Swiss-Prot record:
Chain residue ranges for the region called Aspartate: 195-198
Binding-site residues, ATP: R217, D218, E219, Q226, E472, G524, F525, D526, R527
Signal peptide: none
NCBIfam families found in the cross-reference section: aspS_bact, PRK00476.1
Entry keyword set: Aminoacyl-tRNA synthetase, ATP-binding, Cytoplasm, Ligase, Nucleotide-binding, Protein biosynthesis
Protein's name in the database: Aspartate--tRNA ligase
EC numbers, comma separated: 6.1.1.12
Record's function text: Catalyzes the attachment of L-aspartate to tRNA(Asp) in a two-step reaction: L-aspartate is first activated by ATP to form Asp-AMP and then transferred to the acceptor end of tRNA(Asp).
InterPro entries recorded: Aa-tRNA-synt_II, aa-tRNA-synth_II, aa-tRNA-synth_II/BPL/LPL, Asp-tRNA-ligase_1, Asp-tRNA-ligase_1_N, Asp/Asn-tRNA-synth_IIb, AspRS_core, GAD-like_sf
Annotated Pfam families: GAD, tRNA-synt_2, tRNA_anti-codon
Subunit composition and interactions: Homodimer.
Enzyme class: ligase
């Protein structure tokens, strides 16, 4: 027998008809001689009623949680007093119940999954994925893939797969290495991104490329990181930055409209990197709420309050009224992010009290005017070297968001572009310049003469990040297509011609065979779906993720391999004492 429909497809037009449904027993209860089974499939659930004189009763009496069933019965409305809306207004009166597969007692109650330790859920992921919430997340992901694919196909993009076994090249994180059995002592690397290959496809003349690319980075994990993850990777030839941003805005709006029935206003707001850091202390600001910083460096320059007078930057953030405990917690956040402390003062009437108020004097009135802090509200100050000061206060701003649910009053989704990143940043530990995005990012043409000068830190990149609700969900750039500029970039980061040729020789050769201007972007697809689904971690939108230690608890990976396997690929394992 084949089912007549999914449970979620049942509707009023089928009332009185006999239906065949297949799925899992969510729960079973006995009441007044009747057996009630809640039957679940990926589309929904419905109550099955089995009457004592039904030929289905004996089989139904054996059913326990998570048994796999086929139910044939009459679809009908429930008594009016029992209706709760939707499918809960209906039930199926069983004529036949067939147990297709029995089940052991699950290690946790599926309908209480959120209260179960995550490691247990991950160990029994195949059970965790039966939960309606998890199925909604993965089905949303599937619809997002389909929507993006349809849009890109219509825009003339060509889907091309790039190699999974490639050469190890420096991209910022550690590579996952794969020993070559046929070439002893040599290794492949799993790709951190398809960066060079997609640029080679532009050199090859494919004009517009995309793929849902699997990427691998051996780095420390956070709530929004996995060692293996998915990018929606795109590249376009003969384009300017504006061309790329236009396609991306229309693509993201299409995905949200198709999948969530949500309209993203176009065009997306834009901030420069400098503005984002200056106002929000982050290059991926959450713009669902404002709470921008005020710069008050000038109010304290040369003044008597030494902690602020000599600081490169003094920023202030207006916050609601805060308790001593809350202030202590926010100071802890500031210190975790590089600040020496978090100064504060409270508004009382037309003046300031508490904290550092006794040092403010004539600055108090100007502070109230610039910040617009509410009566009883608190001013939070961060002072010192610019990047440390704004970054610490940016972390405090996000802690305030979580403490007072500040984003709840804003739009459900807020997208923005962050542009004009620095091309280079100085690595204090190494004492040298390094790239901020990757070494193939094109600088602004007017800034190219600054390479090799004392002002090369001022070079702006033609780079752009796509930010959604405070998460970076995409990042890209216009690429260098002039071999001479690529050489200048390598020199700026201390890469000699010989080193560049050893690492990227095949790519540098390709650049010399006629390279079109080109640019692209990659979406962090797991992270995007996480935000769309309202999930707390990308592990909630990936079918079989690793935990925050990079371990697959279900399959038991990573795992030791036999000495014979190691010998076959010429690898010896040493353990540190």
């Amino acid at each position: 027998m084949q089912r007549t429909c999914y449970i979620g497809e049942l509707n009023a037009s089928l009332v009185g008809q006999t239906v065949i449904l297949q799925g899992w027993a969510n729960r079973r209860r006995d009441l007044g001689g009747l057996i009630f089974i809640e039957l679940r499939d990926r589309s929904g659930s419905i109550q099955v009623e089995v009457e004592p004189d039904s030929p289905a009763f004996h089989e139904a009496d054996t059913v326990r949680a998570e048994y796999v069933l086929e139910v044939e019965g009459r679809f009908q409305p429930r008594p009016e007093e029992q209706r709760k809306g939707g499918l809960a207004d209906y039930e199926v009166i069983a004529l036949r119940v067939t147990v297709l597969s029995a089940a052991k007692t699950p290690p946790f109650e599926l309908d209480k999954g959120e209260s179960v330790a995550e490691d247990i859920r991950l160990k029994y992921r195949y059970l965790d994925l039966r939960r309606p919430e998890m199925q909604r997340h993965l089905m949303l992901r599937s619809r997002a893939v389909a929507a993006a694919t349809a849009f890109l196909d219509a825009e003339g993009f060509v889907q091309v797969e790039t190699p999974m076994l490639t050469r190890s090249t420096p991209e910022g994180a550690r590579d996952f290495l794969v020993p070559s059995r046929l070439n002893p002592g040599e290794f492949y690397a799993l790709p951190q991104s398809p960066q060079l290959f997609k640029q080679l496809l532009m050199i090859a003349g494919f004009d517009r490329y995309y793929q849902f690319a699997r990427c691998f980075r051996d780095e420390d994990l956070r709530a929004d990181r996995q060692p293996d993850f998915t990018q929606l990777d795109m590249e376009m030839s003969f384009v300017t930055q504006e061309d790329v941003l236009d396609v991306q805005e229309r693509l993201l709006a299409h995905v949200f409209r198709t999948v969530l029935d949500y309209e993203l206003p176009l065009p997306f707001p834009r901030l420069s990197y400098q503005e984002a850091m200056d106002r929000y202390g982050s290059d991926k600001p959450d713009l669902r709420f404002d709470r921008a910083f005020a710069d008050v460096t000038d109010l304290f320059r040369g003044g008597e309050f030494g902690a602020f007078a000599d600081a490169e930057t003094v920023k202030v953030l207006a916050a609601p009224a805060l308790t001593r405990k809350q202030l202590d917690e926010l100071e802890r956040v500031a210190k975790q992010n590089g600040a020496k402390g978090l100064a504060w003062a409270r508004r009382e009437g037309d003046g300031l009290t508490g904290g550092i108020s006794r040092f403010l004097g004539e600055q108090a009135a100007a502070l109230l005017e610039r910040t617009g802090v509410e009566p009883g509200g608190t001013l939070l100050f961060s002072a010192g070297e610019w990047k440390k000061a704004v970054t610490a206060l940016g972390a405090v701003r996000l802690a305030l968001r979580d403490l007072f649910d500040l984003a709840a009053g804003g739009p459900r989704f807020q997208v923005a572009w962050v542009l004009d990143f620095p091309q280079l940043e100085f690595d204090e530990e190494a004492g040298s310049w390094t790239y901020m995005h990757h070494p193939f990012t094109a600088p602004r043409p007017e800034d190219i003469p600054l390479f090799g000068t004392e002002r090369q830190g001022e070079i702006r990149a033609q780079a752009y990040d796509l930010v959604l609700n405070g998460f970076e969900v995409g990042g890209g750039s216009i690429r260098i297509h002039d071999p001479a500029v690529q050489t200048q970039m390598f020199q700026a980061i201390g890469l000699s011609e010989a080193e560049a040729r050893e690492k990227f020789g095949f790519f540098l050769d390709a650049l010399s065979y006629g390279t079109p201007p080109h640019g692209g972007i990659a979406w962090g697809f797991d992270r995007l779906v996480m935000v769309m689904a309202g999930a707390s971690s990308i592990r909630e939108v990936i079918a079989f993720p690793k935990n925050n230690r990079g371990v697959d608890l279900m399959a038991g990976a990573p795992s030791p391999v036999s000495p014979a396997q190691l010998a076959e690929v010429g690898v010896a394992v040493t353990t540190e004492s």
